[in-house]
Amino acid sequence: MIYNNLKIFSQNICKNMLIVSTIFETHFHFNILFIQEPPWSIICLITSLSCSKGEILVGAPNYPNWLFFARLPTIQLDFLRVMAYINICLSSFCFSLCRDIINHRDILFISFFNNNICSFIMNIYSDASHSALKYFKDTEVNIINLLIMTGDFNIRDWLWDPSFPYHLFISNNLFIIADSFNLDLSLLTNSVPTRYSDTVGESDLVIDLIFLHSGLSKLNNHLIHLE
């Protein structure tokens, strides 16, 4: 079963190119990498017939043996906020970006085939305004067989963060969305923060969450890599 072979690593890297390189150097045992707030910068100058100095090539780094998935910006300031790398060892499952179903810069919706069954995985970055969640609330999206929805949701709640004493209304919206996709919140194997503050006096956070397909025990746990 492919479910036993899906090893997904997810992290908000705050547009830091060095972190991306470090992930590839140290987390090679994963075969799917979900990135939130990725680097999107000048890579090089390419030959141009219209500009003697060359045209600027903007994008994210590519790596050998990895397939790159991202919704490319449609306008200059429409920077992408999620991307994914999938190892070529999974190429036979025909992973594909489904922009015809979900087309939003904060949501990466990817399909794959296993035993002629189409399944999906989803990478999300929800900003402080919860743009991704508002998109789902305002857009009718019929999705079946979504295996995992994960990423940086930017929501604190006592339901998943014991150090936070409140329950927020936006959390209810998140659970309604997850329930519509037949997903359950995955419980941490190790109860630790997912985001450590660099500022003295600020609390560490649990805002990176994983929702898994209901009843699929093979995907029923995850843990935080402290390094």
Briefly describe each language-model feature range.
Residues 1-227:
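A shared catalytic/ligand-binding motif for oxyanion handling
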